[in-house]
């Protein structure tokens, strides 16, 4: 799973995602990518599950780039605990995603194979996505 080595704060406020992605909104490394069209949070487990689904489909060919990194802690209280008495303990990491953000990119395989791999990855994610092809291909 992806996780940061060091963070400034152990617990963050949840916050609210507004607006469109300004950074990471174009296909930069690969030929084809998976772009989010909805706000949401991707946990490190979801990012990894989508990566595995892609890699199993493209087998040994091609290269995959993961363009998001889970750097925000997610907290949870234990089950059957009453509310109050502070914020829960950190249980994992998530990456906040805005519409327009490219999540994954693939290069080195045919576009049809890459499309199918990205579709399989999209089924593992909690946000709606579209497949985008880099201009000039």
Curated annotation (Swiss-Prot):
Record has Nucleotide-binding as a keyword: no
Signal peptide coordinates: none
PROSITE patterns: RIBOSOMAL_L16_1 (PS00586)
Stored InterPro entries: Ribosomal_uL16, Ribosomal_uL16_bact-type, Ribosomal_uL16_CS, Ribosomal_uL16_dom, Ribosomal_uL16_sf
SUPFAM superfamilies (alphabetical): Ribosomal protein L16p/L10e
Keyword Nucleotidyltransferase: no
Gene Ontology MF term list: rRNA binding; structural constituent of ribosome; tRNA binding
Keyword vocabulary terms for this entry: Ribonucleoprotein, Ribosomal protein, RNA-binding, rRNA-binding, tRNA-binding
One GO term describing the cellular component: cytosolic large ribosomal subunit
Gene Ontology biological-process entries: translation
Record note on quaternary structure: Part of the 50S ribosomal subunit.
Summary of the function given for this chain in its UniProt record: Binds 23S rRNA and is also seen to make contacts with the A and possibly P site tRNAs.
PANTHER family to which the protein is assigned, alphabetical: 50S/60S RIBOSOMAL PROTEIN L16, LARGE RIBOSOMAL SUBUNIT PROTEIN UL16M
Family: Belongs to the universal ribosomal protein uL16 family.
HAMAP family: Ribosomal_uL16
Protein name listed in UniProt: Large ribosomal subunit protein uL16
